[in-house]
C-alpha cells in the first residue's frame, strides 16, 4: 500500500503539552495551533527535527530547524509560553506524535539565500523539580496509588492510572515524605524497581524487570541498518545493544522491540534511550536506539 511522501508536521501554539494528543498518542483534529508541514513535495517547507528521548527521569529535547519562515511566524515562536508538537509519518494521514514540549530558544540567521530558524525545545519534565509537597500514607497502601498521587501533582501533564502498573505495597510503618515530587519518585523508583518519565505530555511508568508484552519487530524489511553490542572494560563486558534503523512508527522509550539482523542473533528488550533524525526533504528518516542490560532485555 502506497503511503505517500514521508511527512513532518509542526503544531505551534500556547496549548498545554499533550493537549492536542488523544490518549492513544494520535493527534486530535482541529485546534488553533499554527501548522507547518514538510514532505517530499515541492510546495512544502523544509523542516529537520533531531529529537532525544529516554525512559529515565530527564527532559526529552528537540532541535528543530525550519528554512525560510515568515517574519511573523518567527515572532510568534518567540512569544512566551509557546509549545510545539512534532508529528511524523506519511502524507496520507498516518501520523504520530514523536515530541511535545515547550519552546526554550529561537534563533534565526541568514545562510546564503536562506533564512534558517532553529527552535530548541524541552519537555515538561523539569516542572517536577518545582513541584513540592508533604505527603504521608498508612501501611499497606499500594505503591501504584502513591505514584499516581505524586504524578497528579505535576503541572501540565496527563496521568492515566490504568497505565501505572507498579507492583507492591508499603510496609506496616507507612510512608511519608517532605520535599520535591522528583525526589519522592526517585526514592520510590530505587526501592520498588521502576522508572518513570514524561513522554509527550504523558506520565509513563515502566517496571525494570519486565518489558511491555507487545513487541515491535525491527529487521531489514522494516529498515534495520545496524545492530552492535555495547562493550565496556578490558574484558569487553556487554552492557547492551546499539541499534540504527529507519524510523518505524510506534517505537519510543519503554517500547518492547525484537531485533532480527542477518548478521547478529535475535535480540529482544526494551528501548531505554533513542534519537530521531527526520528530514523528508533530504530523505533523512532515521532513529538510533540504546537497549541496556536490564528492563527485560534478553542477552542469553
Feature roles, as predicted:
Residues 114-128, 158-232:
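Short beta-strand-centered interaction patches in the first periplasmic/extracellular domains
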Residues 26-27, 79-82, 118, 134-140, ...:
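Short intrinsically disordered coil segments
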Residues 74-85, 130-137, 255-259:
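Extended Gly/Ser/Thr-rich low-complexity repeat segments
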Residues 49-77, 208-300:
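An acidic/polar, Gly/Ser/Thr-rich interaction patch typically located in mid-to-C-terminal regions
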Residues 1-120, 274, 282-284:
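Assembly/oligomerization scaffold segments
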Residues 96-99, 133, 267-269:
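Short beta-strand segments
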Residues 71-74, 92-93, 109, 127, ...:
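Short beta-strands and strand-coil junctions in structured, solvent-facing domains, enriched
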Residues 62-67, 80, 121, 134-158, ...:
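Amphipathic, non-transmembrane alpha-helical segments in extracytoplasmic/periplasmic proteins
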